[in-house]
Amino acid sequence: MIIGGSKKDVIKNIEQNVLDNELNKKVEINDASLTDEEISKLLDTFYKNKSKKIRYGIKHALANMTVSKYMKMLDKDIEINGSEKLKNIDLSKGAIITSNHFNPLDTFIIRKLVEKVLKKDLYIVIQDTNLAMSGSLGFLMNYLNVIPVSKSPTYLAGTFKENLRKVLNAGNIVLIYPEEEMWFNYRKIRPLKRGAYQYAAILNVPVISCFTKINDTDILDNEEFNKTTYELNVLGVLYPNGEVSPRVNSINMLNEDYELKKLAYEMAYHKKLEYTFAASDIAGYRWNEI
């Protein structure tokens, strides 16, 4: 399912960023660019809305109904492999899930694992600027189970960490995308950032490592893309080591997760992971017809 109109310029940005070795750089062309003051107001509004229990509860229920509708539409296109690796995991204090980020709706892939297999609630860490989105996607960003992240050190050490702790202590699952930026339908795993693993170490929760393979079909989606299907691969569970610092833990877990995802990519697509650009790196794109 394609959201957001033409992706031609986005794909050009992906190609250029690969050439420049800027593998975590933003590629979307219409993302909000906000000042620190505007972001602070967004976050204040988000938390004030959550405090209005009745009004927020109604909108939260509507957001969940919307998600349920999309889940029914997408369910047949999502296959889950490796869930047996989670059979003995202790989720009493929750867990963090990491995966590759390639579509505004790829959270539905993780949601299927969390809700149908683990029987847990999913919370999603989103960038603060996502709260400024308009339309139905903006509504979902503001009223689903989300935890906005910001570049503010004070916010990260205070509000964000405490909200993350509260959600995890309730036994919920939190999705964090360690690649940070979304690259539309990009197949490859990109370098990971340390935040997800740092918080896993500080809060002493496991990290569930995942990788989604994107499969092409011959079914037309729009004028630029064919439809795609998805294979979510559960790669393993990473645990913090209580004998080393959170920083050392985060580096070790990041490296282990990257190696798992790299191997998963290479096994899924039968090719070595190399950061060059090829047309086949963008799933479903109809290069020869555009």
Give the predicted meaning of each segment.
Residues Y56-G57, Q127, P153, N185-R187:
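A generic secondary-structure micro-motif detector
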Residues K76-E79, P153-G158, I189-R190:
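A conditional alpha-helix N-cap/helix-loop micro-motif detector
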Residues I89, L140-M141, V167, Y199:
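Structural alpha-helical scaffold elements that stabilize or flank donor/cofactor-binding regions
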Residues I80-S83, S134, G158-K161:
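Structural motif corresponding to alpha-helix initiation and N-cap regions
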Residues V67-S68, R111-V114, G138, L164, ...:
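Short amphipathic alpha-helical segments and helix-helix/interface helices
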Residues L91-P153:
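Catalytic core of membrane glycerolipid acyltransferases/transacylases, capturing the structured
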Residues M1-I96, H101-R111, Y143, R286-I290:
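Membrane-anchoring hydrophobic helices of lipid-metabolizing enzymes
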Residues I2-L34, F160-I290:
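Non-catalytic C-terminal accessory region of glycerolipid acyltransferases
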